[in-house]
From Swiss-Prot:
Induction: By abscisic acid (ABA), salt, and osmotic stress. It comes from the Eukaryota. GO terms for biological process: protein phosphorylation; response to osmotic stress; response to salt stress. Residues 299-353 are annotated as: Disordered. It catalyses: L-seryl-[protein] + ATP = O-phospho-L-seryl-[protein] + ADP + H(+); L-threonyl-[protein] + ATP = O-phospho-L-threonyl-[protein] + ADP + H(+). This is Serine/threonine-protein kinase SRK2G. It holds the Pfam family Pkinase. The lineage of its organism: Eukaryota, Viridiplantae, Streptophyta, Embryophyta, Tracheophyta.
Amino acid sequence: MDKYDVVKDLGAGNFGVARLLRHKDTKELVAMKYIERGRKIDENVAREIINHRSLKHPNIIRFKEVILTPTHLAIVMEYASGGELFDRICTAGRFSEAEARYFFQQLICGVDYCHSLQICHRDLKLENTLLDGSPAPLLKICDFGYSKSSILHSRPKSTVGTPAYIAPEVLSRREYDGKHADVWSCGVTLYVMLVGAYPFEDPNDPKNFRKTIQRIMAVQYKIPDYVHISQECKHLLSRIFVTNSAKRITLKEIKNHPWYLKNLPKELLESAQAAYYKRDTSFSLQSVEDIMKIVGEARNPAPSTSAVKSSGSGADEEEEEDVEAEVEEEEDDEDEYEKHVKEAQSCQESDKA
């Protein structure tokens, strides 16, 4: 931590707190995310960090390094100054079809790259898509599941509190193909960009999880009359929102769909992507062995308060305490969310009985 200065808090996600820091020597801004040491550091955390390290794509937040603090495992990654795509939609209300396509094309390219490496995201949503600060923003996928997999593999932030992005097969509690589920979530993201609302929520009763889940299972959605989109766009959505995941459109088919191909930026063409991989030689300086060693040490619970005091300044102690408090608050929100979804699933099962 000695080489970074804290700039500000960025918020909280599935796993804890994120902060903006500046490298003291290079002045580069980075995002740092904290996971509490001890029981939360399991094989899932190790696997996902290694997975993220291997991802080198312009539409994916770049992993930089992991650092062990007295109380947390800190993950350092690229900072996207444009904020969440979610916030951009909240400000705009909804996007034009052209703008929605622009971001959807980038999302699909990033997800397709992950899938080519046999990595599924399982938590794709607007809050997990960031933007850089350029005038024509570059979309960046983030949050590759740094916490234990939940029963649904998808936990919206408490500020959203909806299972709206979750595919039917995930709700069924049976084994499912994460790639198919990612495609469904991409479809929900596209719908929200176009409409400014979730496809399977009852607009008059948005917090009714039971009703939302029933609508997801029945693929019950519609495009409001006030939203004017092309037939090609409607067709693509209808091919994504298919209950039987085996019959759902694949990423390869999406990338050949007429609506997707319209005004496709040249940097998203297959040839341009291949050139990017050859040109981009930057990677994490930490070896897999170094990362695994740090993660292994992080499995040991945080030292006692006295040990923390002897290892750092008062400012560091305050920072660690703040992170811990925010993480605990977020955990409570997640537990409450999971409880509601379990209740909704039980209702769904009782309806079938």
